[in-house]
Amino acid sequence: MTSRWTTAVLDTDQPGGWAVARSPEGFLFDDNGVLFPREWLKRQDLSILAEHGIGHLDGEPVYLLELHSTSEVPGCNWKGLRAFMLDGDHTIYKVLGYAAQIGTWAREHRFCGNCGQAMTQVPRERAMYCQPCDLRSYPRISPSMIVLVTRGDEVLLARSPRFVTGVYSTLAGFAEPGESAEDCLIREVREEVQIEVKNIQYMGSQCWPFPHSMMLGFHAEYAGGEIVCQEDEIEDAQWFNVHDLPPLPASKSIARYLIDVYVARRLGHAEPVLPG
């Protein structure tokens, strides 16, 4: 099946196309959505920090206008990326997720981290360049392992103090330098709840642009230990029966997918599809 959305490095000197606008408050939208005629959008009273050509949607070029600040546009409002994730149009969310990552990266790499000189966008390449240092900086992607630990009809779920009240989720953490995905998973589970795991199975991945994570999802079986929550990181962790689960993460998340797949398998139901 052909994807409606493909990323690309587009020449911002070319006219036309569609554009999305991102400010500190999120993305601009109106009754027709988040895509605006590019030339019209650039004529509005917007504090444009930078423009990036980011790809093609249904064959049409799409650009990002990254803004210094939030501006009022008649008939329009601003909405955060997480809200778009929950809205249901997964293709538009993928466009905005990519735009958010490119905008964040470019904003954070306006100046060279080595010498402090201003960096410039490299033509036809997704990179920022410092000429005095001959240094290129590329978009950051942070690999994070996320795992559902299981024990028969039970699943191990935990909650962070940062979670929505009452919601429990799977365990997760970022990979350290020199660490394999499996080593990271084992370490994170041990650190967060002092549980040992075995029979690790890769389940899929999901881009998580908050701001630049790549979530690698796994199932793992309980191998031993008693739950001891990591101080300041895990507020509570429990074994839950698949027939009696607490409030769970949003259905579009890979955390929810990992849980739903295991529950479906235990109950003999059809397995869900991993959201993009």
From Swiss-Prot:
Enzyme class: hydrolase
Database matches in InterPro entries: NAD-cap_RNA_hydrolase_NudC (IPR050241), NADH_PPase-like_N (IPR015375), NudC-like_C (IPR049734), NUDIX_hydrolase-like_dom_sf (IPR015797), NUDIX_hydrolase_dom (IPR000086), RNA_Hydrolase_NudC (IPR022925), Znr_NADH_PPase (IPR015376)
EC id: 3.6.1.-, 3.6.1.22
Binding sites annotated in the UniProt record for a divalent metal cation 3: 188, 192, 233
Gene Ontology BP term (one): NADP catabolic process
UniProtKB keywords: Hydrolase, Magnesium, Manganese, Metal-binding, NAD, Zinc
Motif placement: Nudix box: 173-194
One annotated Gene Ontology cellular component of this protein: cytosol
Matches recorded under NCBIfam families: PRK00241.1
Protein name per the record: NAD-capped RNA hydrolase NudC
